[in-house]
Amino acid sequence: MTLPHFSAHAATEDTNLKVTTHNVYFLPQALYPNWGQMQRADLISKAPFIENNDVMIFNELFDAKSTAQLKSNLKSSYPHQTPVLGEEKDKWDATHGRTSGAKFTNGGVSILSRYPIMRQEQHFYTQGRGADGMAKKGFVYVKINKNGHPFHIIGTHLQSEIGKRPEGKDAEIRSTQMAEIRQFIKEKNIPKNEMVVIGGDLNVIKGSSEYHAMLSQLNVNEPSYIGHNQTWDTTTNSIAKYNYPDLKPQYLDYILVDKAHAQPSQWYNNAHRVSSPEWTVSSWGKTYTYQDYSDHYPVSASNAE
């Protein structure tokens, strides 16, 4: 395996960081009552990939009840938790970006930390379309203190593709959203010897031309990839297969390190192809059984396998 080249500011053993991101597919139960959100909230909180992280980034926390259940279940392991993007405005240290316009749901992103959160901010993207345009899409920024060492984490969920034939518009919106992330980092004036991590469902297919543009635009090194070769897999994931049986599997979820700040000696993204205990839902007299935590697989990142 060829490791990515990381420049100066190598992290020492006592400043290692392990982050996991997971798009949990908590759609609002009022609109989508048959996706086992409450069952999956309990299953996810007990899943092996949840254990032993420093930071968790969650996407698609659109349903209030299952989100509250998940966060409550994880409170003992991850006591420091941001609100969901777009909610509880008085609990954020700062709010940036586009705050006007009618939105029908929150932004779905929350960060949970084993270590104290020193600062938490939310930013709303200026552009979005389709269902994303009706949500308070943006990113969550936290500064955490791990045993005296500061780390900066941005969790986000970029514009999704609309329809089966991309027209380029969604990629253009993702590009503007990445530019907002870069501008935010620039304006924060974060010390160069402190690590900055960007993670979440970025909706960019690994290996595509957009992927290589993303690495450049976000100013991040390409990580080493281990684990499953897709994070949204219609051939192995029962939920993804049910929803989109004709679409090809895709690698969409990442945890990346900003080049301009402290670097680990190596950085792995590990996609976990994990099955959950069986859970069932009923609709119109028919019972459906699934064995997946979500339609996306979680991704963990660290500087050690």
Regions inferred by a protein language model and the residue ranges of each:
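Bacterial N-terminal signal peptides
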Residues: 1-4
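Acidic/histidine-rich helix-loop elements
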Residues: 21-41, 96-101, 129-133, 159-173
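N-terminal, active-site-proximal structural segment of metallo-dependent hydrolase catalytic domains
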Residues: 6-76, 86-95, 106, 179-182, ...
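Structured beta-strand-rich core segments of catalytic domains in phosphoester-bond hydrolases
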Residues: 61-159
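Metal-dependent phosphoester-hydrolase catalytic domains
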Residues: 187-197, 203-305
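His/acidic metal-ligating clusters that form di-metal
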Residues: 138-156, 170-212
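Active-site environment of divalent metal-dependent phosphoester hydrolases
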Residues: 26-28, 63-66, 161-162, 203-209
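Structural recognition of the beta-strand scaffold that forms the well-ordered cores
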Residues: 18-21, 54-59, 82-83, 109-111, ...
